[in-house]
A protein has these predicted regions:
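Class II aminoacyl-tRNA synthetase-like tRNA-binding/catalytic domains
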Residues: 2-236, 244-246, 329, 434, ...
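Short, glycine/acidic-rich hinge or "gate" loops at secondary-structure transitions
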Residues: 147-151, 251-263
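A translation/RNA-centric and nucleic-acid-associated enzymatic feature enriched
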Residues: 149-240, 269-462
């Protein structure tokens, strides 16, 4: 496929990044011939040489049969930079003296191509900068970065999460000896085992998987940042989250076209206050299914379909999640940056209850512009109570006809050994990148995120 249209230049090949970087060295001035490379693209009636982040207009100063530019071709070009009078130090275009075709495209432009990559280049660079900032944030606070397995024996019992199954088959043993596991939905169980082993301040940024979730805010695989403080309360973690939010977002977040100021201290509300304002009743007087169903029915808060579905399952949390979609999320969308604290106990399987009010769990979530970003607990350390809650989850899963995952016995053993009083939080990195860039879909900040056909609903790989 390679064809040279001129003798190979003895000039050193200079990347577009180096050629166009601010403050280029004298040997990259417009008076000297240059050799660079990239992909050809047609833009606004002109040819350009591009990579994911940069585009340089080309001026073909010669005519030669067979040298016609080809959209998408990978090429090397030799010639001179041309600068404008108004910006003598900023290259305006490149006068091409010779061109070498390295590869001609053999198919139509793929989904992940130079054209799409050019739109994602800023987001990819933003992720790299954010990763550096996150690491510096925790280094400055004497946290230890840890790595735990992505493939685990038991990912959890949560009724509302569906783990991705994964198995190991030794080719030299029979199928009955296969080891069955799951891709973790969170590193929480493994990290708490490290807390029980004596580690006190730990953090991790990792990929996690949750089956079935493909929306503008969800992808089956996403990046989760999780950290824990042993011997410290929930206020310390909440302060961490607020400080890190400003490190990652600065003084402003963007939800699509909407700008949200982060200059003022983040608002704090209890879930009781949120529901009182959004729905007009006291959720702590309705922590049993029949009581909440009666309120939703009498006040006509939910549709008959939603009420009937909840009646069939006899699940308090189903009623709550319907209220969340119809009332709570829209209400929080009007509040800028807000920590929602003190959740009803049925919504916090892994959190401690408040000693003064067992109806309330020591849980918080951070919302900015109505987007849920972080979820934290004062961690439950009682192994018997934790097992009871897991068993209740499994009972609910069975009633709903859902698969029954294994009990997380190794995590429960760590609780039996002794988990120190601890607080922790999980934060969605991709969503923070969306709020930094104003992206409206997770695919804009995660180039390989899965897609769902809007007509058929079918999911597909990128």
């Amino acid at each position: 496929m390679r064809r040279k249209t001129s003798r190979q230049s003895p000039l050193k090949l200079i990347s577009l990044n180096e050629l166009l970087r601010p403050g280029a060295s004298p040997d990259q001035s417009s008076s000297l011939p240059q050799r660079t490379a990239g992909r050809l693209a047609r833009r606004a009636e002109a040819w350009h040489l591009e990579n994911a982040a940069l585009s340089l207009k080309l001026n073909f100063a010669y005519q030669r049969a067979g040298d016609a530019p080809i959209p998408g071709a990978l090429v090397e070009v030799c010639g001179h930079l041309i600068t404008s009078k108004d910006a003598p130090l900023k290259p305006h275009e490149f006068s091409v003296n010779s061109i070498e075709f390295l590869h001609r495209p053999q198919l139509a432009e793929p989904a992940l191509s130079a054209r799409r990559a050019s739109r994602l280049a800023e987001a990819v660079a933003l992720r790299a900068r954010s990763n550096r900032d996150i690491r510096a944030f925790f280094d400055a606070r004497d946290f230890l970065e840890v790595e735990t397995p992505n493939w685990v024996e038991a990912a959890g019992t949560d009724v509302h999460l569906s783990p991705v199954s994964a198995s190991f088959q030794d080719p030299h043993r029979s199928a009955k000896d296969a080891i069955h596991g799951q891709l973790h939905t969170s590193p929480e169980f493994s990290m708490k085992r490290l807390l029980a082993a004596g580690m006190e301040r730990i953090w991790q940024m990792t990929k996690v998987w949750r089956n079935g979730e493909i929306t503008p805010l969800h992808n089956p695989e996403f990046t989760l940042l999780e950290w824990y403080r042993a011997w410290e309360g929930l206020d310390a973690i909440i302060n961490d989250v607020e400080h890190l939010s400003r490190v990652l977002l600065g003084n402003q977040a963007r939800v699509g076209e909407r700008a949200i100021s982060l200059e003022a201290p983040f608002l704090r509300m209890t879930m009781q206050q949120v529901i009182e304002e959004a729905c007009g009743f006291d959720i702590l007087e309705a922590t049993e299914f029949d009581a909440l169903l009666a309120i939703c029915t009498e006040r006509k808060l939910l549709s008959e379909n939603s009420l009937n579905r909840a009646r069939k399952l006899h699940r308090w949390d189903e009623l709550f999640f319907e209220l969340e979609i119809d009332y709570i999320d829209p209400f929080l969308g009007t509040k800028g940056a807000v920590f929602v604290c003190d959740w009803p106990t049925p919504l916090a399987v892994l959190a401690r209850t408040k000693p003064e009010d067992p109806r309330v769990a020591q849980r918080f979530e951070l919302y900015i512009g109505g987007v849920e970003l972080a979820n934290g607990f004062q961690e439950l350390t009682d192994p018997a109570e934790q097992r009871r809650r897991f068993e209740a989850d499994l009972t609910a899963r069975k009633a709903a006809g859902l698969p029954l995952p294994p009990m997380p016995e190794r995590f429960l053993e760590a609780l039996q050994w002794g988990l120190p009083p601890s607080s922790g939080v999980a934060l969605g990195v991709d969503r923070f990148l969306m709020l930094k860039s104003g992206a409206e879909h997770i695919r804009e900040v995660a180039p390989f995120a899965m897609a769902r056909d809007p007509k058929t609903g079918k999911a597909s790989w990128s």
